[in-house]
Structures are given as C-alpha cells and as structure tokens.
C-alpha cells in the first residue's frame, strides 16, 4: 500500500520535479539497480504504448477500459521496489511529457493522395524515355480529369453526353499531337536536363553582375549630372537676382502726362492705319486681279495665233518652192535653190519670196 500511495504522490507531483532530483536518484543507485531500472523503464514504456494503442483502437468503451488498465499498472507496481517504482514513474512522466508535446505541436499531415491519381503514373511504362513518359502523363491526367468531370455534368440541364465525349476525344487528340510536338522540339527533354540549367544559371549570374556594374556606373553618372544641374540652377538664380536689383537701381519712372505731350505722341498719332486701308481697298484689289487674269488669257491666245500663222506660212512657202522648182530646167541655180530649201529661210524672207 505504501508503494501505491507513493507512486500516486509522485504521479501528481511529477511535472513539478526538477532535474537535480533525478540526478541524485541515478547517482545513489548501484549497477544492479540501474539494470533493473532500465528494464522497468522499458516495461513501463511498453505499457504506455499498449495503453495508447488500446485507447486509439477502442475509444468508445469509456471508463471500464481505463479502470482495468489502472489496475494492471497497480499490480505491476506492487512487484517492484520503491527505487524501481520511482525510476519507472519518472520514465513514464518523461514519456507522457514527450507525448503531450508531440500532441500539441504535431505537424498536420497532408490529405491522402487519391488512388486513381497514383495509378496514372503506375500505368506508364518505366522503360520509356523520360520525355515520352511526361507526355503520356499529361495525356492520361487530362483523360482522368475528363472521367471525373463527366458524372458532375450529367445532372446539369442541357448536357449532352455524346457531344461531351466527342469534344473530349478531339481535345485529347489535339493534346496528343501537341505533346508529340513538344517531344520532337526537345521542350520536354529540357525539363530533365541539369547541365544546361547550370550553364544558363552561370550565364544569368554573369549577365546580372554585368547589369549591376552598368547600374552603378549610370547611378554615378546621374549623380554628377544632378550636381551639375544644381550648380547651373544656382548660377541662374544669382544672375536673375542681380538683374532684378540692377533694373531696380537704373529704373526711371516717367509720368504719363509728360509722355502724352511729347513729340513721340504726335508721330504715333499721325501714323496711318495700313490694315484699315487695305481692308477698304479690297474691292479694288479684287477688280485688278480679274483684269490681270483676263490680260494673261488674251496674251496666251495671241501667242497661240502667232504659232499657227508661222506654221501656215512655212507650209505655203514650201508648196510654192516645189511648184517653182518643177518649172526650172536642171541648172546651177536650181541646185542653189535646193540648198536654200534644205535650210529654210526666215519668216520675212519667205514672205517676200512668196510675194515675188
């Protein structure tokens, strides 16, 4: 009975006990007692694990199971010495503490994977290439999603199973062709290549370092330009302030009465308003424009008449020359006239010849 009461007291005051008391108990034990302690601790841990399994397997039995389990533990504790009981309850307290910590800070596990999803990867042959397996996985996952979507759409209004399956088959064919194209292009194979990725990473790092250098250079250049701009702005402000002070110093106020009585006022008042004059004479300018247009048209007509008359005179002179040449006998004068016909004379000469 004393052992039971002592064990209950230790069980109630277990969380408050310190590590120094545990160390004192372990140092006071002999090697035989230490071996007995370890065996007892193993038995108690096994009992605690059996208790957890029993509670997890039958949580609905209530207090009967707890009472029987407590009686079994008490019967075990009667066969142990006080030191062994304290050591066993210390181990039990530590195991309970670890269990409580695990229960409070336990990481939540993910939901179990659906069995059909795992069968997708198992149905693909391992002997195929990695790119081919990836394409098959894409196609099979699409077909699996179609199969899971079909029962949900059957209850909707206006759903046609035949059209849905026809569209699904056409889409699967398109996806198959697309996956084959990706395989032939080498896009799927790039997903499994590490060397190219490392090379691209190195090139990316080099380009990033180069860009950082350019950014630092541009930032320094921007700072210099900003400093130069501030310098010029300060100089411009100083120049404006100086100009305003000089204008205030050299400014001379003139009264309006003296300005109105000067000779400049008379000159400004006698200045004609040319814009008003032009507006008044706009009709005259329009008539002059019409007259000039008519004169230009008449000059063009006279020039055309002169061209036609010259052409007519040339034709008449040629005809008269042919007639006169036919009446003459072969002679040196005829040859001379032929030469003259080859070089046509001027208008006045032809007119005089025709008159003769």
Swiss-Prot record:
Residues 1-28, 73-93 are annotated as: Disordered. There is a cross-link at residue 253 (Glycyl lysine isopeptide (Lys-Gly) (interchain with G-Cter in SUMO2)). One of its GO terms (biological process) is skeletal muscle satellite cell proliferation. It is found in: Nucleus; Chromosome, Centromere, Kinetochore. It comes from the Eukaryota. The keyword Cell cycle applies. Residues 75-89 have a biased composition (Polar residues). Keywords: Cell cycle, Cell division, Centromere, Chromosome, Chromosome partition, Isopeptide bond, Kinetochore, Mitosis, Nucleus, Phosphoprotein, Ubl conjugation. Residues 8-25 have a biased composition (Basic and acidic residues). The modification Phosphoserine is found at residues 28, 30, 58, 77, 81, 109, 125, 331. Its main location: nucleus. GO terms for cellular component: azurophil granule lumen; cytosol; extracellular region; fibrillar center; kinetochore; MIS12/MIND type complex; nuclear body; nucleolus. InterPro entries: Dsn1/Mis13. The keyword Nucleus applies. PANTHER family: KINETOCHORE-ASSOCIATED PROTEIN DSN1 HOMOLOG (PTHR14778:SF2). Part of the MIS12 complex which is required for normal chromosome alignment and segregation and kinetochore formation during mitosis. Component of the MIS12 complex composed of MIS12, DSN1, NSL1 and PMF1. Also interacts with KNL1, CBX3 and CBX5. Interacts with KNSTRN. This is Kinetochore-associated protein DSN1 homolog. The gene is DSN1.
